[in-house]
Amino acid sequence: LPCRVRSIEALAPDVRCIRLQLPFSERLEYLAGQYVDLIFPDGVRRSYSMATAPGTLEDVELHIRHLPGGHFTDRVFGVGSRPPLKEREIFRLEGPFGTFFLREDSDKAVVLLASGTGFAPIKAIVERITALQAAGSFRRPVRLYWGGRRPADLYHDALCRQWEKDLADFQYVPVLSDARP
């Protein structure tokens, strides 16, 4: 599928949220937790997990951490020799892929573990759980452990704390290896 960069937003000094717009006539069918491949004009592919549950947004949301020297991430952060990524730029998207997704028919507790931008598919899964709880079809305990070195690495900490208030039987446990700010 072709996709267009709708927006680029800083979530943390080294993390950006990129929203990709699909053609109006296309819908991407996927399960919360799956990933897509971005295919660049030179044929290089990069895989990124989608950070929104199906049906919550028309856009595909990706969380990108800067890896210095990275083919795509240097462009996202406007460093290196390639031109910086701009809104309205077009890429190809392929997918969905992956077997990491919420098993909605299970009766077992849900334990979610994430580190860094590995939070993206977890965010999509919790958004799906939110929709299921609102419909009255999800009654399982959920525990989310999100790890990082510093508090700033948990770039959606406030969102996780809001989920803890809003969702039934949901617990958020931030895990830091270096708690100094």
Give the location of each predicted region:
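FAD-binding FR-type
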Residues: 6, 14-112, 125-131, 176-178
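Edge strands and adjacent loops of beta-rich recognition modules
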Residues: 1, 7-11
